[in-house]
Regions:
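NAD(P)+-binding Rossmann beta1-loop-alpha1 motif at the extreme N-terminus of oxidoreductases
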Residues: 1-53
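Short, charged/polar "capping" segments at the starts of alpha-helices
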Residues: 33-38, 100-102, 146-147
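Hydrophobic anchor at the start of a short beta-strand
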Residues: 3, 24-25, 91, 111, ...
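NAD(P)-dependent Rossmann-like dehydrogenase/reductase catalytic/cofactor-binding core
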Residues: 207-294
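Internal alpha-helical scaffold of NAD(P)-dependent oxidoreductase catalytic cores
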Residues: 86, 103-107, 126-176, 185-227
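General beta-strand structural signal in soluble alpha/beta enzymes
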Residues: 111-114, 163-167, 275
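Rossmann-like NAD(P)(H) cofactor-binding subdomain of soluble oxidoreductases
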Residues: 31, 45-129
Length: 294
C-alpha cells in the first residue's frame, strides 16, 4: 500500500515508521525532520526498536492509496488544503478531538475515523521514541462496516501494528473524547503527569469532565454510559501514569492546545457541562493572553 502520513510528528512518525516496514510510506513534516529522515532514515527507539527508510517530504503531491492525518485538530483545515494536491483513495484521521473527519470530508474521498493509543515522543529530528505499546482502532466515522476499513486494517496488521477494525466508531470516538476531556485539560492546567489523576481532587475533576462528555454523547444519540466513560478514563490513567499528556506538553512549550476540539467541543453543546466549560475557559484564556489564538 502507498501511504502518505500528513503531520509526521510523534505519533505520525511512529505509525508511519511501523507501516514502512511493509509498505511504501511518505512522511510529510517539518524541514529538519524531513531532512534527517532523507539522510539517515527514521530511527525508532523505546518499546519498539527499528531503523526504517520511508520517503520524506515537506509537501504533498502525486497519488496514494491512503493518507493518514495526524496533525493537531486546529491544523486540519491546512491538512485539507495540502491533501487536495494528492490523489488519495482514502483518508484516515488519527487525531484528538471531534470535528476532524467532518472537515476532511471536503476532500471528497472516503474518510475513516481512527484512534491510536501507542505512546510516542519525538526526541530529535529523524528519531521517534515509542513510550508505550497500544493499538489502532479504525472504521467508518458513522459506524458500520466497509471494505475499505477492512483493507486498511489488514495493511496495518501486515506491518505488525495491533489493529482493530470497528463497526462502532461513533461510540469509540466519544469514549476517546471523554478520556481526553478528563485527562488533557486537567493535567495541562495543574502541570502534573497522568498518574496524578488516579485519586484526590484532580481525579474528581477528570471524572466529572468525562461524565459530562458521556452525557453530551447521549444527547447526540450515542449510547455511552457514564460508567463506561469513567472506566475508560481510569484505565488510561493507570496505563499511562508516568506520561505527560499532549496538552500538558503543549502548555509547557507555549504552543496552542487542542482545547477547542476537546473540552470546548463538549462545552459548546446544548447540555449543561460546567466542568468542561470551566476547563475550556481557563485554557482559552491562557491561549488568548499568550497570543496563541487562530
Amino acid at each position: 500500500m502507498d501511504v502518505v502520513v500528513f503531520g509526521a510528528g510523534s505519533l505520525g512518525s511512529l505509525i508511519g515508521g511501523l507501516l514502512a516496514r511493509e509498505h511504501v510510506v511518505t512522511l510529510v513534516g517539518r524541514e529538519d525532520h524531513v531532512h534527517a529522515v532523507q539522510e539517515d532514515g527514521l530511527r525508532i527507539t523505546g518499546e519498539i526498536q527499528a531503523v526504517v527508510r520511508p520517503r520524506a517530504s515537506k509537501t504533498v503531491s502525486g497519488a496514494a492509496d491512503l493518507a493518514i492525518v495526524t496533525v493537531k485538530a486546529h491544523d486540519t483545515p491546512a491538512a485539507v488544503e495540502a491533501l487536495s494536491a494528492c490523489d488519495c483513495d482514502a483518508v484516515l484521521s488519527l487525531q484528538n478531538g471531534m470535528g476532524n473527519e467532518e472537515r476532511l470530508a471536503a476532500l471528497d474521498t472516503e474518510i475513516l475515523a481512527g484512534t491510536g493509543t501507542y505512546g510516542a515522543i519525538q526526541d530529535e529530528p529523524g528519531s521517534v521514541r515509542c513510550t508505550g505499546l497500544g493499538e489502532v482502532v479504525l472504521g467508518p466515522p458513522d459506524g458500520g462496516r466497509s471494505a475499505l476499513a477492512d483493507r486498511v486494517g489488514d495493511a496495518f496488521k501486515a506491518a505488525g501494528i495491533e489493529t482493530t477494525v470497528a463497526s462502532d466508531m461513533p461510540k469509540r470516538r466519544w469514549e476517546k473524547l471523554a478520556i481526553n476531556a478528563g485527562i488533557n485539560a486537567t493535567t495541562a492546567l495543574s502541570r502534573v503527569p497522568n498518574g496524578a489523576l488516579s485519586d484526590g481532587p484532580l481525579s474528581d475533576v477528570a471524572r466529572r469532565a468525562a461524565r459530562e462528555t458521556a452525557r453530551v454523547a447521549r444527547d447526540h444519540g450515542v449510547d455511552l454510559p457514564d460508567e463506561a466513560a469513567i472506566a475508560a478514563l481510569e484505565s488510561v490513567v493507570d496505563a499511562t501514569a508516568d506520561n505527560e499528556s499532549s496538552m500538558y506538553r503543549d502548555v509547557q512549550s507555549g504552543r496552542r492546545t487542542e482545547v477547542e476540539a476537546i473540552n470546548g467541543y463538549v462545552a459548546d453543546s446544548d447540555v449543561e457541562t460546567p466542568v468542561n466549560e470551566t476547563l475550556a475557559a481557563l485554557l482559552r484564556g491562557w491561549e488568548r493572553e499568550s497570543k496563541l489564538g487562530e
